[in-house]
Amino acid sequence: MRAVRVHKYGGPEVLTLEEIPVPEPKAGEARVKIEAIGVNYIDIYQRTGLYPLKTPFTLGTEGAGIVDAVGPDVTGVKIGDRVGYAMIPGSYAEYVIVPATRLVPIPPNIEARSAAALMLQGITAHYLTHSTYALKKGDTALIHAAAGGAGLLLIQIAKQLGATVIGTVSTEAKAKLAKEAGADHVILYTQADFLAEVKKLTDGRGLDVVYDSVGQTTFDKSLDCLRPRGYLVLFGQSSGPVPPFDPGKLAAKGSLFLTRPSLAHYTLERAELLQRANDIFNWTAAGKLKVRIDKTFPIAEAAEAHRQLEGRKTTGKVILLP
């Protein structure tokens, strides 16, 4: 089968398309013939070695397709089932092996590309808004990278929960998308200081929560945006990792809360995984949640997909097709 492999860490140029054997499922596993692959920032972290993996490895952590083989002792999944998955290595390929308990059934009215676009970022938006900091009516939230795949989903879910949403974006075109998703206010951080704008928009009160996937370049000001006992939810680091800092700053700035959540810990039990995924799929099918697939590339052009994602030339989701 064809797979995009990494033999050494580096830029997009290290991605190589190779022929490797089709894997066989072991006990408790299923093999999925992949129809669509989600591209995520975690793929870039792994490619560059920020999140180191033993080389060589097949990149990718998200996809959707059809079960075409199962190993012994598999229940609840059968050959022919349409399924999605997230946080499973080896997705930039034609086939992937997945523990059967980590597969999510895809409803008939959700196509494979939409499922691949929703599994990681949709479930992330769900747990961030329902569990990490459970948004409620009257809350005011700041969402960085508001026109990205996760950002657009976060806006929509936050509005469903009754929150006032402020988004940050880099261009007028991205501001339009964030507004269309439901953001109450959009700040162009390339033209204005987002901290100063937040203070104006909240009459100096500050925010209940900041959802920050950017990291290094936004971290300090994100903390300064918060009200006393506010929450900074740091769920990514697209601008680089946050340098070490003194936790005493959290007390000095208002007894703030800082958390660095991971999808894996918010879907530990299969029941929780299914609940979150089913909510996302049901909202999408009902038209309450719209997923934006911005660009689609053949798997052979994975490097170009990475260049565009890193270069902030995308909005919504980027998909690869095997």
Across the structure, where does each feature detected by a protein language model lie?
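Short glycine-centered segments of the SAM/dcSAM-binding site in methyltransferase folds
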Residues: 82, 140, 164, 230-231, ...
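C-terminal hydrophobic helical "lid"/dimerization subdomain
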Residues: 270-322
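Short amphipathic alpha-helix with an adjacent loop that forms part of the alpha/beta core around
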Residues: 194-204
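Mid-domain Rossmann-like dinucleotide-binding core that forms the NAD(H)/NADP(H) cofactor-binding site
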Residues: 116-192
